[in-house]
Amino acid sequence: MENENLKKGILFLVFSAFSFALMGMFVRLAGDIPFMQKAFFRNLVSFAIAFFSLAKEEKTARLQKSKSVFKISGKEFLFLLLRASCGSIGIFGNFYALDHLNIADAAMLNKMSPFFTLLFCFFLLGEKIELIPLLAISTAFAGSLLIIKPSFNLTHFIPSLAGFFSGMGAGFAYACVRKLHSYNTSPSLIITFFSLFSCLISVPFILINPVPMTLKQFLILLGTGLAAAGGQFGITFAYYNAPASKISIFDYSQIIFSAILGFIAFHQIPDIFSFLGYVIIISMAAVVFFYNRRNSRT
């Protein structure tokens, strides 16, 4: 049974990785629509799906006369707000990067999030960081510089920095999710709150600079939202079936999918510096993965 759940966890995580890679391709395919408008549609679809799931949970809770999923403490609301704020920064940064970088580069910078999660869990949850993961984090940051390529060429540097901050925002958001898990907050409530918050943040930017869309662009953005929802729920079911210490490394398959889709759709090929950055970051993720796996057995 444990092996069966492990296989399910891996399959769900690879499905999630492919879905997020597909989302990245759709973001780029949508063309010259402002990234905030793209993010709005991504979050709107996710909100609709998550709210439907949340409504079902609430209905079940009422039938069983158990605690309402909407009944939360002040501390829970604070971490929901922090998760939504930093998650929104993560999405906006990621979408801006996807519009201006190779989609594999943008995906890799966003995948810095697990390293940031380790750091933020230290500050938020008091979780100890061992020497090996700390060295891996430092090396991964060095690897990210090969992708960012700091320079006075703002055309590349600013989108790269946005991609880096997308990983930072996502990392803080995941640390908040860890904290919310300790309060037994409904995952559907977390996703619903975050998606609605991001939608509302996007609205003023869309009103200031509305851009008409063709039917094709609308359908692509609908696909963006569906792919994002698939990725979000895939990762949720993955970690429901198996612990992160045994499957998290498979999340980096998104980089492979992104590179393939980027080549097929846009003829994008990462340069040698980006490729070296990928190798360093994924290698450090593997170091942390196997280190945690070994420690979980002792």
Would you name each region that the model predicts?
Residues 8-16, 62-93, 158-166, 212-230:
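Loop-to-transmembrane-helix transition segments
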Residues 113-135, 256-275:
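C-terminal transmembrane-helix exit sites in multi-pass transporters
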Residues 25-28, 35, 50, 152-213:
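Transmembrane alpha-helical segments that form core, pore/gating elements
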